Amino acid sequence: MTAAPDVPLLRGVPARGGIYRADRTSPQTLADAGWRVGEIDSGDPRDLVIRVGEVLGFPSYYGRNLDALADCLSDRTGPTALVWHAWGDAAVRDPRTWSRLLEVLQEATERPGPPLALLLARPWAEVVPG
């Protein structure tokens, strides 16, 4: 198990998508800049797939699995940020699903189109499986 120091701290509004550490002001800063911001407080990576659909208003046909998550995230129409407050709990609780979920989200942040940012909140004393 290792800490995750390689995830940069978000300062201001990013020019492109990515995965960032968030401070208390990051969600409001992005919302003020016109980003759609969804906040999720779940320590279960499987639940996150459902919660993302809820907070971002995915269509009723959303399949609530990783493939459906990837598809719906690629259909975004404007800059979008997901603030995940309990990510450390998810990483420890189910490392395999956490890893797969992070891979899907990382790929989604790299796709062309409006930026997508995943903001990992909470104190950075969290432990992430390596």
Please annotate each region the language model reported:
Residues 2-130:
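Positively charged, polar, low-complexity stretches
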